[in-house]
From Swiss-Prot:
Pathway: Amino-acid biosynthesis; L-arginine biosynthesis; N(2)-acetyl-L-ornithine from L-glutamate: step 3/4. This is N-acetyl-gamma-glutamyl-phosphate reductase. GO terms for molecular function: N-acetyl-gamma-glutamyl-phosphate reductase activity; NAD binding; NADP+ binding. The gene is argC. InterPro entries: AGPR_AS, AGPR_type-1, NAD(P)-bd_dom_sf, NAGSA_dehydrogenase, Semialdehyde_DH_NAD-bd. Catalyzes the NADPH-dependent reduction of N-acetyl-5-glutamyl phosphate to yield N-acetyl-L-glutamate 5-semialdehyde. It catalyses: N-acetyl-L-glutamate 5-semialdehyde + phosphate + NADP(+) = N-acetyl-L-glutamyl 5-phosphate + NADPH + H(+). Belongs to the NAGSA dehydrogenase family. Type 1 subfamily.
């Protein structure tokens, strides 16, 4: 089988690096285009971990050139930059998996939390790529909004329980992420003397992923729920651990509900005890555990924020869009010990 040509726009950051690593070894996709805002370097010089692995040139991003050479583009760009690039590539008949927030939300919510939207036409038909809940739509899609990392871990855990929640129940989400989730650019919070041996909340009750979680609960759960979202930065390189608390209508067997919903999902692992980051770091798996005490529900989920929360989820979405096996090229072995 001839490999399908694909490209990455935005190879300089952590998610771009993860895309590079997976696509360079993908059995059905050929990476023929890698770009950033400057170009003029090889991937091994841009990412020292790839020296001696690939001599692929990094080019200056050009939507026309990208569309000419690729059937599908992965956009690992900041919000607003992504929609500008995607709009032109889509107009040239190519498919896009966008890892930014530009196509994840309704117009009203996006503009309330980000900026004016510059591609309303494509926003209206973008598919939110949470595979276990949108597989059929993804297969038919031309544009995928790749979910955010916190929403991925939170939604996969709580969505099966929405029908069982008390009508007045809010969701309380305690989320902890490795520092790579803050991106490659150095900030005060990610500076080594700040984050080392430290743990703190940031953007409490105001993080941009809060409306994303709330909107998708309303989409798939058919009920609006108030989401109280508190993210924390941890002194870990990668990984994400989420605890979601809610109030049930009546006592349930929490693990039985998860087994019924996810029994045939190859990348959801249901655990018999609370989850841990070490078991998922370096993989595409989402591990979930849940328990209830009376009408109180606790859902515990873990993912690799750079993989299941970004780049491997993007690869899985592309696989489905291109008619390939969903799990092709996805990492399964954790970085353990």
């Amino acid at each position: 089988m001839k490999k399908i040509p694909v490209g990455i726009v935005g190879v300089s950051g952590y998610t771009g690096l993860e895309l590079l690593k997976m696509l360079l070894e993908h059995p059905y996709l050929e990476l023929v285009y890698a770009a950033n805002t400057e170009g003029g370097v090889r991937v091994g010089a841009l990412h020292s971990s790839l020296q001696g692995v690939s001599d692929l040139s990094v080019e200056k991003a050009d939507p026309k050139e990208a569309a000419k050479r690729c059937e599908l583009l992965f956009l690992a760009l900041p919000h607003q930059s992504a929609m500008e690039f995607a709009k032109e590539v889509l107009s040239l008949g190519k498919k896009v998996v966008d890892l930014s927030a530009d196509y994840r939300l309704s117009l009203e919510r996006y503009e309330a939390h980000y900026c004016p939207h510059l591609d309303k036409e494509n926003l209206s038909h973008a598919v939110y790529g949470l595979i276990e809940w949108a597989r059929e739509e993804i297969v038919q899609a031309r544009l995928i909004a790749n979910p955010g990392c916190y929403p991925t871990a939170t939604l996969l855990g709580i969505l099966p329980f929405i029908p069982y929640l008390d009508e007045d129940s809010s969701l309380f989400v305690d989320a902890k992420s490795g520092v790579s989730g803050a991106g490659k650019k150095l900030t005060h919070n990610t500076h080594y003397p700040t984050i080392n041996e430290n743990l703190f909340a940031y953007s409490p009750l105001s993080h941009r992923h809060e409306p994303e979680i709330a909107e998708k609960i309303e989409l798939w759960g058919k009920k609006a729920k108030k989401v109280n979202f508190i993210p924390h930065l941890t002194p870990l390189t990668r990984g994400m651990l989420v605890s979601t608390f809610a109030r049930l209508k009546e006592p349930v067997d929490a693990m039985a509900i998860l087994r019924e919903r996810y029994a045939n999902e190859p990348f959801i692992r249901l655990r018999s005890s609370p989850v841990e980051i070490k078991a998922v770091a370096g993989t595409h798996f989402c591990d979930i555990y849940a328990m209830s005490q009376g009408r109180d529900l606790w859902v515990n989920s873990a993912i690799d924020n750079l993989l299941r929360g970004a780049s491997s989820q993007a690869i899985a979405n592309a696989n489905l869009m291109l008619g390939l096996p969903e799990g092709a090229g996805l990492p399964r072995f954790a970085y353990a010990p």
